[in-house]
Amino acid sequence: MLKPLGDRVVLKIEEKEEKVGGFVIAGNSHAATKTAAVVAVGQGVRTLTGELVAPSVKAGDKVLVESHAGVEVKDGEETYLLVSEANILAIVE
């Protein structure tokens, strides 16, 4: 399992397929944002005074993230997206 460092967050992107004229198009290929599930969260970042600022998201949250943010990583057979917390736009409730 991946354990992110600092303010990084491991996400599992929710893939949606669309069909146009019989062709299957990846659902997120043209969208500005993606919906994802938070899998793991880093401990946060330290301020200049050394205080730890905890992340705003937690494992299990459903979030909206910028579509071109982060780095795709594989852990076994699963593919995840590793992003900075700043690339997460909102928590979906």
Swiss-Prot record:
Secretion signal, residue range per the UniProt entry: none
Record bears the keyword Cytoplasm: yes
Main location: cytoplasm
GO MF term list: ATP binding; metal ion binding; protein folding chaperone; protein-folding chaperone binding; unfolded protein binding
SMART domains cross-referenced by the UniProt entry: Cpn10
InterPro entries reported for this sequence: Chaperonin_GroES (IPR020818), Chaperonin_GroES_sf (IPR037124), Chaprnonin_Cpn10_CS (IPR018369), GroES-like_sf (IPR011032)
GO biological process annotation, one example: chaperone cofactor-dependent protein refolding
Record localization: Cytoplasm
Coiled-coil intervals: none
Record Pfam families: Cpn10
GO cellular component, one term: cytoplasm
Keywords, alphabetical: Chaperone, Cytoplasm
HAMAP family the record matches: CH10
Function description: Together with the chaperonin GroEL, plays an essential role in assisting protein folding. The GroEL-GroES system forms a nano-cage that allows encapsulation of the non-native substrate proteins and provides a physical environment optimized to promote and accelerate protein folding. GroES binds to the apical surface of the GroEL ring, thereby capping the opening of the GroEL channel.
Subunit comment: Heptamer of 7 subunits arranged in a ring. Interacts with the chaperonin GroEL.
Cross-referenced NCBIfam families: PRK00364.1-4
Family (UniProt): Belongs to the GroES chaperonin family.
Stated name of the protein: Co-chaperonin GroES
Protein species of origin: Streptococcus gordonii
Recorded name of the encoding gene: groES
